[in-house]
């Protein structure tokens, strides 16, 4: 048998892939297979399908966007396999007919959506985009750490009955008040360590934000950033996300 295009639905998980094939001619999914979570297993599966559909068959593989990211996409396309990442909320087949969730059923739904074009593809970032995104995640991780240490300092003060009379926390006046506190014995050392961590993280975030401003001037991003900066209150680090 020779078919022009075979659509391969892939339900991907950390430990395993569930695969199936779908053709417009047959109007049904077939050749279900569960494999290890390895792109080479997908390549082996496609070779198996060639023995059924012929050497002239074209394969289009697809999987839902999720925690797996773009790794599988890049691995398959590097091996000249067309791959599409589907936006889950745009999959019409999933919305209307999905009932009992199983890996096999999910793979079938993905294959059908590919064949019937009932989906919108996810934008695939460039390698530079991904690097920048990881940089932003790292900056946000430090921001969360700063938020945590702020909470710890305020909790420490509350436990030891140090009450600030000013209106706002983390102003220059509040920081001056914190540094002027004189807890007894080891408590002083504890507060000093908290404040040192606070200052270190604050300085680092300021440095990272300056680096993000530099990245935003690159040709790939500067025009979009320039347009969005017209909105009041929108910062560069937010635009990048």
What are these regions (language model features)?
Residues 1-239:
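A detector of single, family-specific signature residues
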């Amino acid at each position: 048998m020779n078919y022009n295009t075979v659509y391969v639905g892939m339900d991907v998980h950390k430990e395993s892939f569930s695969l199936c094939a779908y053709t417009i001619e047959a109007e049904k999914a077939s050749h279900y297979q569960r494999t290890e979570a390895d792109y080479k297993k997908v390549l082996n599966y496609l070779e198996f399908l060639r023995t059924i559909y012929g050497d002239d068959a074209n394969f289009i593989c697809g999987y839902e966007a999720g925690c797996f990211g773009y790794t599988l996409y890049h691995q398959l396309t590097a091996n000249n396999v067309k791959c599409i990442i589907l936006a889950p909320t745009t999959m019409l087949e999933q919305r209307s007919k999905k009932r009992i969730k199983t890996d096999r059923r999910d793979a079938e739904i993905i294959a059908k959506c590919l064949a019937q074009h009932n989906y919108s593809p996810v934008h695939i970032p460039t390698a530079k985009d991904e690097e920048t995104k990881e940089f932003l995640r790292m900056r946000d991780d430090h921001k969360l750490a700063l938020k945590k240490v702020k909470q710890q300092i305020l909790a420490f003060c509350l436990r030891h009955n140090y009450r600030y009379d000013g209106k706002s926390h983390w102003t220059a006046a509040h920081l001056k008040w914190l540094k002027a506190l004189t807890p007894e014995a080891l408590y002083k050392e504890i507060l000093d360590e908290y404040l040192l961590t606070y200052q270190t993280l604050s300085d680092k975030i300021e440095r990272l934000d300056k680096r993000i401003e530099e990245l935003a001037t690159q040709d790939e991003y500067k025009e979009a950033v320039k347009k969005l900066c017209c909105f009041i209150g929108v910062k560069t680090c937010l635009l990048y996300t």
